[in-house]
Amino acid sequence: MSGPSANPRKTETMRDLGAVDIGALRANVMAIPEAVWVAENASKPNKFEVLDGTRHIVFRFVDGPLDWRGSHDRPAWAPWRNLLEPVLADAVRDYGYARGVFPRVMLARMAPGGFIHPHIDANPAAKWPHKIHVPITTNPGVVSFFGGAERHFPVGQAVEVNNLAPHWVRNDGDSDRIHLIFEYYDPDQPAPAWLAPLLQASVAR
């Protein structure tokens, strides 16, 4: 991997974080009106070509592509916070961070026939936090490639994935695949040595 080095705490393949209780969250996600999906997807900050037709509802997002330490709530966070926070906390319990932060939190909805093209999460702000998925709904035709192997993630099973190696997702089934996807980091872990020079260089441009 060239450029800024990854957080040594991140998984290099995938890490099973165990089952989480998504009952209340799932019921509410499945009831989201189509018009809300359309509106939220139109205003999302993560409009990347590799994501193809995958739609998103973004609850929290980083302030910029270089530094994960700055992030903000988006309008959808407040009405969903009480449903999201228990799931987030349950999924990250094994990390043991005293003051863990979630810089990006979103729902990702892939329709039947959808495809997320092979890619890595290239922006520096993605190199430090853990990248975690919790499937809300899926089907047997959903295949993900993470950690050098094809995988199928079951509903309610939290997993950290390696977002810095090539990965892709394909939905060959006949129903939507919806994941809760978020990042998580320890603010008490010292920032990497490469971050300050990177930020200084960006200001000097």
Positions of the model-derived regions?
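A short hydrophobic beta-strand segment most commonly corresponding to one strand
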Residues: 129-135, 158-160, 175-192
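Non-heme Fe(II)/2-oxoglutarate
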Residues: 1-97
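A short beta-strand-loop-beta hairpin characteristic of the jelly-roll/cupin
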Residues: 135-154
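Fe(II)/2-oxoglutarate
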Residues: 1-8, 197-205
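Conserved short histidine dyad/triad with adjacent acidic residue
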Residues: 107-125
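Short beta-strand His + acidic residue motifs that chelate non-heme Fe in jelly-roll/DSBH
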Residues: 118-119, 142-144, 161-162, 166-174
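Tight coil/turn sites that cap or link beta-strands
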Residues: 112-113, 156, 164
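A short secondary-structure junction signal
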Residues: 116-121, 143-148, 192-193
